[in-house]
């Protein structure tokens, strides 16, 4: 039975306001979660409006299926495939806004059985969709030491990546780890210098979770797909929670707002320049949570909301 873990939606009003909701518009909530953003979007839509929600977490799907609204539909799958979902419904180029709330949700962190948290002992899983792919335990038991170290360094920015990777491999040789507490203890023991403000396993758990769920690849594919999915004037409203996510979003919006970069002095006709295309997006800005929101929900502290608009190019 699914427990009712509380989830406070971060930057709720700001992210939805960023979509500039039209009552008859068609919108996508690519990360339904517990439905905070979706419910607010629905409250602003008229009878002709539509909302397509996506999530790969079966628990989120169960929550979404309880919403009885003809304007609303839910898809169980990764948001990276949003272009396919839209094409199946013959809505390519007709979407008025896409909202993405990236990273792991509070219910996923708080449920020990999901294996996302080093603070709660549970199965070493970390999959956002437990029905697909390798669990964290399975990957750590089969991966090479060098590959584990690369993941910890690349996705966790862990300076002791090699030491921790060696400790993980040695422990798994003795007895395979299957619990989050076991991994947290191995990482803590392998970390020579402790940060008094952060648990030593924080970066390792982040890195393994990102790797197991292909999170950064998911983001990159969804952003790329958004250009074909959005209607002219359609909005992108994206919340990220750590620098790796935000870097991808920021770079994408910046590149698509500049248009093709042609070296100075390159002999090209006006027709050739036009063929290259213009700016795909107009960046509208970024927002951070206010002091009041952070005080009420400390997990909002690192969040960043970036908003962009599809041009007519």
From Swiss-Prot:
EC number(s) per entry: 2.1.1.199
GO biological process entries: rRNA base methylation
Chemical reaction(s) catalysed: cytidine(1402) in 16S rRNA + S-adenosyl-L-methionine = N(4)-methylcytidine(1402) in 16S rRNA + S-adenosyl-L-homocysteine + H(+)
Compartment annotation: Cytoplasm
Keywords: Cytoplasm, Methyltransferase, rRNA processing, S-adenosyl-L-methionine, Transferase
Keyword S-adenosyl-L-methionine belongs to the record: yes
Record-annotated disulphide pairs: none
Binding-site list for S-adenosyl-L-methionine: 35-37, 55, 79, 101, 108
One Gene Ontology MF term: rRNA (cytosine-N4-)-methyltransferase activity
Top EC group: transferase
Gene Ontology CC: cytoplasm
Parts forming coiled coils: none
Domain of life: Bacteria
HAMAP family: 16SrRNA_methyltr_H (MF_01007)
Protein function: Specifically methylates the N4 position of cytidine in position 1402 (C1402) of 16S rRNA.
Family label: Belongs to the methyltransferase superfamily. RsmH family.
Protein name, per record: Ribosomal RNA small subunit methyltransferase H
């Amino acid at each position: 039975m699914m427990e009712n873990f509380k989830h406070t939606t971060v930057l709720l009003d700001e992210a939805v306001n960023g979509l500039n909701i039209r009552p008859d518009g068609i919108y996508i909530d690519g990360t339904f979660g517990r439905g905070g953003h979706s419910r607010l979007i629905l409250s602003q839509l008229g009878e002709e409006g539509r909302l397509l929600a996506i999530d790969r977490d079966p628990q989120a799907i169960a929550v979404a299926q309880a919403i009885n609204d003809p304007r609303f539909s839910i898809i169980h799958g990764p948001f990276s495939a949003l272009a396919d979902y839209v094409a199946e419904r013959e809505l390519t180029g007709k979407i008025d806004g896409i909202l993405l709330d990236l990273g792991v949700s509070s219910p996923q962190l708080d449920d020990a059985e999901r294996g996302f948290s080093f603070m709660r002992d549970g199965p070493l899983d970390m999959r956002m969709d437990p029905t697909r792919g390798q669990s964290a335990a399975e990957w750590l038991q089969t991966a090479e030491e060098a590959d584990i170290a690369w993941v910890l360094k690349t996705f966790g920015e862990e300076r002791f990546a090699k030491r921790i990777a060696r400790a993980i491999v040695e422990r798994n040789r003795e007895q395979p780890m299957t619990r989050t507490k076991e991994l947290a203890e191995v990482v803590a023991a392998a970390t020579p210098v402790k940060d008094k403000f952060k648990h030593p396993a924080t970066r390792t758990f982040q890195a393994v979770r990102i790797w197991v769920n292909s999170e950064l690849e998911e983001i990159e594919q969804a952003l790329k797909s958004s250009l074909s999915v959005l209607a002219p004037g359609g909005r992108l409203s994206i919340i990220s929670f750590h620098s790796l996510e935000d870097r991808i979003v920021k770079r994408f919006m910046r590149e698509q707002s500049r248009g093709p970069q042609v070296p100075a002095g390159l002999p090209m006709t006006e027709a050739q320049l036009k063929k290259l295309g213009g700016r795909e997006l107009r960046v509208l800005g970024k927002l951070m949570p206010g002091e009041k929101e952070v005080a009420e929900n400390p997990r909002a502290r690192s969040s960043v909301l970036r908003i962009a608009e599809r041009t007519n190019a």
